[in-house]
């Protein structure tokens, strides 16, 4: 089968924003204008096409990043047909992992901001992630029809708070109730959309007289930004003082793809104005798969290599999301980076080194699906019938294995015990939790060995609440949930050198003998665990060294202070001895474990607690209350900012253990007028009195 759309006309984009910027509505309008979706779904009624899980519709927030394919020929039908794959990303901070994983497979992003609220805390998180993956982006200022809407204020905030370099390519005509349309600064014409046709028809008219000066000023800034893309354009601009439309678009496109600037547009998705022009900007300024650097990976021999976005290359793809579908079972969303694959082909899951047959391939449109026979470089599709694949796995041609760069998932910071209500729920719960953990790598399930309870861990209270809710709806499991518990960790302050562990049992017959000497050091924050083999002269035979490592790793799970996992330590195995007959793997595993426990005791162990970055938006009158309360929760105030349209943003670092039930007390402190967001920042040493209380509670 030949390719329907040339790869140069593909755009793999994400629509990203904070809650309530109107992202889902914006996506809906995109689907409507691209002709996929003939009746507009509204979030207000809980009927939006992209939000396809029941809880998303109830809560009106987007949780799952669904992928949809749409086609666009320009709002005036003036482009050849382009294929736009849209990955919807959630806006709530507990779902940052979803944003992160979709950023990995995007080529470009459209950041949606509220014209009233401007840049919110979550916008900063998303922006940082887009920077991390070097994702070219556009800014779309939505809700221009709302009271307090101010396009230029958002422009200032993008520069100040995000250190962005926005370049407006349109200027709004009016604002709030008087918002009529936009002036296209490239064409220097006003665009007025026809309300009767829900914005599918529009007219170019002359720029309103009162806006001419403003438009000239902003056009000059835009042309200058385009001219800076290369020397030839700069010289032409300096000589002629002007550039052609094509040169402006080319200059802005090159700089957008290089992540130097962000074209900025505006509109109101709800009132059907502006999204159409934004879609044209996606075609004009965001990259196709061939405009960005080829994906890199490792071959079997560990050599680094790259795969170009071309059908002639060997097949490689990345599984970026797993979903359970009530009709077809497990769906694996994957992005094809190179080559072609057909349904029925055998693939290699290079991450797990397992071969699997690709069953059916589905092209997703929000919650509808169409079966297709093949996918090519640049495509995003869903596979049915892959049993082994999980998020972040590389799928490739078995004859040409490659492992693409893996995604890194954060460690959970909050845990809860969960118990089935009846015996019948017990079995179903295990199945449901495993299925959910497979879908979401930032959600973990384990059994507490002492109490036998099932413990679930995740990125925040809302995260766990939604997963327990899904268990009930999708798997019919009724469960009771315990109080949230903080995921404390243990580490060391000092080093401990030459600590030995000796496991000897000799009581006639075959005995046990293992002897290991280690040095324990603190490694840098977030590094985890590191094992170094420094054995010389075969004092411990090669085959027993992994057993020492294994024994230490088992002991890491439960530290010496209060049984919390140990992090950020480096163990060097320096010496030991063995017995020809009595030594075995188990003896060295025990020796490693004993040496590590003793080394931990000597190395001044400390308790670490998760610190959260908290941002509170509050009217100025309550500022003192909010700050006093945060300080009372052992919070460290990091700074304050003014909000668009009055009010203050207070930024603080607060221990997670002090933040339970915060939303209730914030409501009473501020008469329900303040809001807050919270995300995990890092682990920090717990103060002595706090640590002692936690340790005594745990060791009672």
Curated annotation (Swiss-Prot):
InterPro entries per record? EFG_II, EFG_III, EFG_III/V, EFG_IV, EFG_V, EFG_V-like, EFTu-like_2, G_TR_CS
Checking CDD domains in the record gives: EF-G, EFG_III, EFG_mtEFG1_IV, EFG_mtEFG_C, EFG_mtEFG_II
Write one Pfam family the protein is assigned to.
GTP_EFTU_D2
What's the chief localization of this chain?
A: cytoplasm
Q: Which amino acid positions bind GTP, per UniProt?
A: 17-24, 88-92, 142-145
Q: Does the keyword Protein biosynthesis apply?
A: yes
Keywords, alphabetical: Cytoplasm, Elongation factor, GTP-binding, Nucleotide-binding, Protein biosynthesis
Name the protein family.
Belongs to the TRAFAC class translation factor GTPase superfamily. Classic translation factor GTPase family. EF-G/EF-2 subfamily.
- This chain belongs to which protein, by name? Elongation factor G 1
Question: Can you name the source organism?
Answer: Burkholderia lata (strain ATCC 17760 / DSM 23089 / LMG 22485 / NCIMB 9086 / R18194 / 383)
As recorded in Swiss-Prot or TrEMBL, the protein's gene is named fusA1
